[in-house]
Amino acid sequence: MLQTAPARSCAPLTARRCRNCWPARSAAGWLRLDRTAIEVDHCAAGALPIVALIAFLLGLILAMQAYVQLRVWGAEIYIADMVGVSVMAEIGPLMTAIVLAARSGSRNAAQLGAMVVSEEIAALEQMGIRPLAFLVAPKVVACAFAALALSIVFDLVAMCGGALFAWSVAGIELDAFAEQLRQALSVSDLLVAQGKAATFGLAVGVVGCALGLRVKDGSEGVGRATTNAVVLGIFLVIVIDAVFVTCQRMLVG
C-alpha cells in the first residue's frame, strides 16, 4: 500500500509569502505606501470638488457680510483682512475636517467594521499580517495628508471667492486685495493653520478606524459605528480647535 505523507499546515508558509510580497513599504515596515497612496486619492481627490465649492461660496458670503459692515465707514478694503484671517485661522481647517469626517471617517468605520463582522481582520492576523500596518496606518496617514492638502485648497478658493465679490461689488482691484491679504497674514499664521488641519485629519482618521475595529452586533453595529465616527470625529475636531486657540492665546499673551 502507498504511504501518504502526513499533512502539514501551510499557514506559516502563507504568512511568510504574504509578508515578503508586500511592495512599497516604508523603511520601518510599518506603513504600506501603495495602500496609503490609494487612500490619499480617495480622501483628497474624492473630496476636492465639494471642498472647492463650499470654499468658494463661503468666501463670497464672508466678503458680503464684511462689506455690509465696513462700507458704513468707507473701509471696504478690509474685506480682505476679514476673509483672509477668518478663513485661514478657523473656517478653512474646520470645514475641511468636517467634510473629511463625513466622507472618509464614515467610510473607514464602515469598511473596517464590515471586515470585522466578516472575520477578514481575524484572517489577516492568522496569516501573520498586521491589520494596523496593512489597513489602519494607511487610512490615518491619508486622512492627515488629505486634510492638509484640502485645507490649502480651501483657503485659496475661499480667498478667490472673496476677491471676486470685492472686485465686482465693492470696486476693489484684485492687486489691492492681494496686497491687503499679504499684509494681514504671516508665515506663522499659515504654519499654525496647516498644523491644525493636519491634526484634525489625524483625529478623524484615528476615530473612524478605532470605531470600525470595535464593531459588534453585525450589520447594526456597522451602521452605529459609521454614525458615531462622523459625530465623534466632528466633536473631537472642535475640542482640538479649542485647545489650539487657547494655547495660541496663552503663548501670544
PLM feature spans:
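Short, membrane-interfacial amphipathic segments enriched in basic
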Residues: M1-T36, L211-G212, K216
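Hydrophobic alpha-helical transmembrane segments of multi-pass membrane transport/permease proteins
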Residues: I50-Q65, A242
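Short cytoplasmic-facing helical segments at TM-TM junctions of multi-pass membrane proteins
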Residues: Q111-A137, S219-V222
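Membrane-interface helix starts
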Residues: S26-T36, D41-L53, I234
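Membrane-interfacial helix-loop-helix connectors in multipass membrane proteins
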Residues: M64-A89, L156-A198, L202, V206-N228, ...
